[in-house]
Structure formats: structure tokens, C-alpha cells
């Protein structure tokens, strides 16, 4: 190694030392001329082309935060929920794409989309860590300004629940004042859930699924079905013979596992910030959220682990 000296190049570029400019480098070009030459060959003039901000509609997104209270912490509360809604939008997009793929018996693309939804849910789980930096005192300062608005009223979350099979006709009521939104939520309620379509897939693959399970009232929550569990039992006992269905089963378990973690972190964050006070939307708050932890989306896939 060459010792430092007059002829040695400068060390780490982050140290503040400056190396002599190599002879082959162009000299520094000041002012407007530098802009014309570009910076690392990057395009710098976007007066006639689409920029990053244009493509992402950043003006609209970054102007969508309107705190109602004078409290500093309300910005965190707003952005936490807005970003969660964006992730839910993507989760719904991917789930619906996976559902279409399952209907068309194209399982590999569905696996990719389901895996992405699980990663989205992991992202949502981690987001609670940011909101949990808000203390009870800080939340109390802004809570009076929230009125009766609550995450309970999120129509994207409701569609996500319905699409995953947790159906409840009463959950249409919070959206009755918005006919356009009500139509979207009702359509998801009345259609087969993702798991319903997977059960139909089992039937198409030759498993004897009870007819009443294949054609039921889609607005009702799912109940455990012995014929569906028997099909999954066969899949798990002979995975090599039913590899695509085996992989589908595990993707669904991954998905529900991530969904449960999201729900759990929601509960613990609420308990940490507001304790056991009533929620702004009128629910019992943390006790209501804890009750939701008992909801099982894909019952046969969990029970079959006991019978194997």
C-alpha cells in the first residue's frame, strides 16, 4: 500500500479531502452552462416532458393532508392512515387479479400476486410502529377534532375483509350516505370471496365438494365444511400429486397469518394509545378489535393441520 504523500490520491471521498482532478475529467462548468451539460448525464430540464412528480401526481398526494387541530402530531395520524389506504388499494388490486387468475386456472400468476399481498400486509404491520410513537397525551389533544370518523368506516378495508371471506351485511350501513361507494362494497359482498373461488377450483380438480358449498349465499360468512377439509387433507397427504393446490394452500395460510398480525398490531397500538376507551366510530374500541382476532378466514386450512 502506498503511504500518504504528495503523489498519493486522496482517501475516502466522504472524509472531506479533495483529490487532484484527473487530467481526463472535464473542468467544472459554472452557472447555466453546467445545467446544459447535465449532471451525471441526467436530464435536468422537464419543461417539455413528464417529470417524476408529474407521473406520480405528487402535488395532489402531498396536498391531501389537512389537519383540523393545532396539534403537531395530527400530521402523523393523517399520513399513517392515508398511506395505509394506498397499500390497501394495491392489496385489493392484487387480490382481484389473483381471483381472476384462479377462475381461469392460471395458478402461477395467482401465487405471485398472493405473495405480494402478504408482503403488503407485512408493510402495514410495520407501519403501526410509527403510529405507536404517539403518546396518549398527544392523541388526546387531537381526538376532539376527529368527530366520528374512524378506520372502522374504511370502505377499502371493508372490501378487503369481504374479499377474504369475512362477510357481514350490516357493514354496508356505514357507506349508505355514499351511493357510489356503497355500490362497490355491495358488489364485493355479493360476489364469491377469494377462498370461495379456491374451493370451486378444488371441485374442478376432481375433489368431491358438497354442492351446497359450491353454490351458497355469498353474502354470508363462511362456515367449516367437511368436504373442503377432506380435499385439503388429500392435498397435504400427497403434495407431489397436487403440487399447485398444495402451493395455493400455503399461500393462503401465509396470507391469513400476515392478516392476523396486522389485526394484532392494530389492537396493541390502540391499547397503547387510548387504552380501553370507546372508539371514535362508536365501537367498544380495543375489545371490539380483540374480538376480530378470533375471525378465521380459511377454517379448513387451519383445522386440517390437526387432522393430518
UniProtKB/Swiss-Prot annotation:
GO molecular function: heme binding; metal ion binding; tryptophan 2,3-dioxygenase activity
InterPro entries, per database record: Trp/Indoleamine_2_3_dOase-like, Trp_2-3-dOase_bac, Trp_2_3_dOase
Iron is among the record's keywords: yes
Job of this protein: Heme-dependent dioxygenase that catalyzes the oxidative cleavage of the L-tryptophan (L-Trp) pyrrole ring and converts L-tryptophan to N-formyl-L-kynurenine. Catalyzes the oxidative cleavage of the indole moiety.
EC number(s) per entry: 1.13.11.11
Feature: compositional bias, Low complexity: 17-30
Pfam family, one: Trp_dioxygenase
Keywords of the record: Dioxygenase, Heme, Iron, Metal-binding, Oxidoreductase, Tryptophan catabolism
Protein name as it appears in the record: Tryptophan 2,3-dioxygenase
Gene3D superfamilies: 1.20.58.480
Catalysed reactions, as listed in the record: L-tryptophan + O2 = N-formyl-L-kynurenine
Source organism (scientific name): Burkholderia ambifaria (strain ATCC BAA-244 / DSM 16087 / CCUG 44356 / LMG 19182 / AMMD)
Residues reported in the UniProt entry to bind substrate: 77-81, 139, 143, 280
Family: Belongs to the tryptophan 2,3-dioxygenase family.
HAMAP family: T23O
Pathway this chain belongs to: Amino-acid degradation; L-tryptophan degradation via kynurenine pathway; L-kynurenine from L-tryptophan: step 1/2
Reported cofactor(s): heme
Gene: kynA
